[in-house]
Every structure is written in structure tokens, then in C-alpha cells.
Curated annotation (Swiss-Prot):
One of its GO terms (cellular component) is mitochondrial large ribosomal subunit. Keywords: Mitochondrion, Ribonucleoprotein, Ribosomal protein. CDD domains: Ribosomal_L16_L10e. This is Large ribosomal subunit protein uL16m. Belongs to the universal ribosomal protein uL16 family. Its main location: mitochondrion. InterPro entries: Ribosomal_uL16 (IPR047873), Ribosomal_uL16_bact-type (IPR000114), Ribosomal_uL16_CS (IPR020798), Ribosomal_uL16_dom (IPR016180), Ribosomal_uL16_sf (IPR036920). It is found in: Mitochondrion. One of its GO terms (molecular function) is structural constituent of ribosome. The gene is mrpl16. The keyword Ribonucleoprotein applies.
């Protein structure tokens, strides 16, 4: 997974975990998606594992659009604590808010039941709770 090439500030404060997502709450590209039902952090290793599992399970049945990218650096303190500052960036993570669409599945050739099995398999690997959403006849979003 790629990391940000250049950022103005690499060492950030921790973000607020209380708020809900207001912008990315509906499916835009695909018929099926994975929606976060709680707020939390996704680290880069977790993102890579989730991507690998979904690609492995779905193979060539559809295109997958991942709606997350590691934006924030997680720092560790150095060995000498006194006056050393904040520390170097050790990992990258992204904040996933409750209600946001995290993954979309485009050009699906699978039924809703088969898709639900894949998402249930993938949900065990997530550090937050997620659920499947789908668009029914292009009119509205259905909770499954």
C-alpha cells in the first residue's frame, strides 16, 4: 500500500472519534458496498490484509473501489525521553467514521446472497464493525 509522498505536517494530533460521517454515506459507483457501523482507526497493515482478502475471495467477478487511504502518521517516542520531541512516524492510519462507505463493488456479477457471504468473511478481519449495503433497482439503499 502506498503512503503519502509529501505532507505539510506529518505528525498530527489524534482525531475526534465521536462524530458521524455526513458526506460519504451512500453508494456512488457500485451496487454493493461495505458500510462502517462504528468509528475507529484502520492501520496500514489492516488495510492491506482487507484488500488482499477481498481480492482473493472475489477474483474476477467484479471491480473493487477502496474508499480509504492512510493519511495520518502514528508516532512512537524514542528511547531517550527527555526533550526529544514527539518522535518519528512509525505507522500510517486513517480514521473511519460511523456511517461512511468504505468499500464499493462495481460491475457485480454475483447475487446478493453470495456477496453477503464474502462480506461476512471479510467483516471478521476489520477492527471495526461493518455491514453490507446494496442499491435496490437504483432507487434506494437497502440495509442487509
Amino acid at each position: 500500500m502506498k503512503i503519502p509522498n509529501r505532507q505539510k505536517f506529518t505528525k498530527n494530533h489524534k482525531r475526534n472519534l465521536i462524530t458521524k460521517e455526513t458526506r460519504k454515506t451512500g453508494l456512488v459507483l457500485g451496487n454493493y458496498g461495505i458500510k462502517a457501523t462504528e468509528t475507529g482507526y484502520l492501520k496500514m497493515k489492516q488495510m492491506e490484509r482487507i484488500k488482499g482478502d477481498l481480492v482473493k475471495k472475489l477474483k474476477d467477478n467484479m471491480d473493487i473501489y477502496f474508499n480509504f487511504y492512510p493519511l495520518f502518521g502514528l508516532t512512537n517516542k524514542g528511547t531517550a525521553r527527555m526533550g526529544a520531541g514527539k518522535g518519528e512516524v512509525s505507522e500510517w492510519y486513517v480514521l473511519v467514521k460511523k456511517g461512511s462507505i468504505v468499500v464499493e463493488f462495481i460491475k457485480s456479477r454475483m447475487t446478493a446472497g453470495a456477496m453477503q457471504k464474502v462480506i461476512r468473511y471479510s467483516a471478521n478481519k476489520w477492527p471495526i464493525k461493518v455491514r453490507m449495503t446494496q442499491i435496490k433497482q437504483g432507487l434506494y439503499e437497502k440495509k442487509i
